[in-house]
Amino acid sequence: MLAIAERAWRGGGTEYFDGLGTILPSEDTEAFKEFADFEKRMLWHKEHTFKGYPFAYVKQTNVKWNITDAFPNGGDMDKVFPPEQELKDIYHYNGNTYGVRQAMGAGIYLRHVWGDMVPAFYADPKENHTAYAYTWVYSPKDQEVGLWAEFQNYSRSEMDLAPLPGKWDYKGSRIWINGCEILPPVWTATHKVKSYEVPLGNENCVGRSPLAVHLNKGWNKVFLKLPIGKFKMAETRLVKWMFTTVFVTPDGERAAEGLIYSPDKQK
């Protein structure tokens, strides 16, 4: 409602189709400053106007990632590539060079479900590739926090199947914090036949309690493996090559305080 009101009263937003699409622009641009201002005002309304109501949004203009160029996986979602051994700015693999670029936000689309119509992180994404995203998160103390994480944001108008037990999605996405793999929650929807009459359960991260994770005092490594096979699959009609990852309070009400997200360990 607030986002629609912003556009209705203040205009703007043409970059969704005509510019960067789903990707936040660099911090020194007017478009970023406008979004950061909107985010600040929206979070004020969350704390005051809508206090006590579910409001599944936390600050994300401080969340920074490094994302690699995508490696061809030949349809093998488990295939291991150089970023899993060592983080670098440039990778050389099978005679090709793969770079790293920065992105900002708690939720990143590598490829939008509408394909070329809406720009996303990759200008020309291909099927059967694997990307990696990582950042370092500075915590001022040892603490237990909540984790919002998902790799397929389920559309409630679809009759998609929930992931299989122990899997984040049907693409093979994985997440590690300080080298320890974080497993998905127990999915509440277990049906195997798609039907509009069967509601989804806790597939989306904001529709469930955050996962409890521990952050060490100092820098914590967050590492994501993001494979993609075909852009169409039987289990989910809209294949979303994306991720959401951000730390929140254990109750999920607010962003975890005092954290610095920096892929270069810059405070």
For each predicted feature, which ranges?
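Accessory carbohydrate-binding/adhesion or oligomerization-edge regions at the termini
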Residues: 36-128, 156, 187, 221, ...
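Generic structural detector for well-ordered beta-strands
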Residues: 66, 136-138, 212-214
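Beta-strand-rich ligand-recognition modules
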Residues: 160-161, 166-243
